[in-house]
């Protein structure tokens, strides 16, 4: 690890994101305010007003326009950032496809917020996961430190494989809650994240090109294949960047799934984001009570870490998949992805889906303990009473 003195700041998740944008030397920000994302953009605007950041800020009239502006700026070779939540992310949908298809390494923070109606400003992963097929990579932060680190790593990964990346944090649980974050001195960030070397630039007037023009059936197929390959290639890049980050700064992200106690666990809890902090605390207590249980925190949902999941599945009898989201007419989204990843690979642990915390409903250590007791019964009996459990349902 590089010897350095971290800059300790007590900041919210949103401010952690803004500081990462500052330290990444982002050149262009285009955004439209929406609760609970707003303070990210306000803090960036403060940096600009105080002369701390040399960022071109583009005020726009909607989230669709924000992403359109980001696309234009990124296509000229700039390092570009935006942020949004929920309905704003949904309004961006068309442009998300465009950014990925044009191979533009834009980084966006999505502050997870439940989709309306009914209106809700609280935590729910459905907004980001409903964009899983747009071609964006997705990193889920457990805490404010991971928000800061995640933005820095997302830029390096995205600019290496030329695919946009989304860093996802929980509404209010992280976005407006203050924690100590160890920030990195600017000169060390510069060494880790050098200036962007664009795949192409519309500002290169000596070598004019067209981007996004019509592709006939003779060519379109290969464009999709190349984007698909970029996602697969991103897995190695993610691990390499995560390992380098750990070697430089002491926080290792070389695994796409952070895991513990897999070797002796009968079953593991699998989930993403801030709820996994609760799970970790509960697992420590449960193990002291004699439960053979572990956890698997999915850091990167896209590209999906199927190889790492298979290693876990081969070691345990069961997986309790915790989804703070739901795909209507189906089941929890992480549950679907996990089952699909294992289907042709031999490992078939018993899997049960628990729908938890929708719309920001509290998910506590006591809830994890209750789910552990249910999973213990499932493992002992060898069969499911039901595949999907709406755990928090009022009865």
Curated annotation (Swiss-Prot):
- Species of the source: Pyrococcus abyssi (strain GE5 / Orsay)
Could you provide one GO biological process annotation from this protein's UniProt record?
Answer: organic acid metabolic process
What the entry lists under InterPro entries is as follows: PFOR_II, Pyruvate:ferred/Flavod_OxRd, Pyrv_Fd/Flavodoxin_OxRdtase_N, THDP-binding, Transketo_C/PFOR_II
Keyword Endoplasmic reticulum appears in the UniProt entry: no
**Catalytic EC class:** oxidoreductase
Protein name in UniProt: Ketoisovalerate oxidoreductase subunit VorA
Where are the annotated coiled coils located?
Answer: none
Q: Which Pfam families match?
A: PFOR_II (PF17147), POR_N (PF01855)
According to UniProt, the reaction catalysed is: 3-methyl-2-oxobutanoate + 2 oxidized [2Fe-2S]-[ferredoxin] + CoA = 2-methylpropanoyl-CoA + 2 reduced [2Fe-2S]-[ferredoxin] + CO2 + H(+)
Q: How does it assemble?
A: Heterotetramer of one alpha, one beta, one delta and one gamma chain.
Q: What is its EC number?
A: 1.2.7.7
* Record-linked CDD domains: TPP_PYR_PFOR_IOR-alpha_like
SUPFAM superfamilies with a match to the protein in the record: Thiamin diphosphate-binding fold (THDP-binding), TK C-terminal domain-like
> What keywords are assigned to this protein?
Oxidoreductase
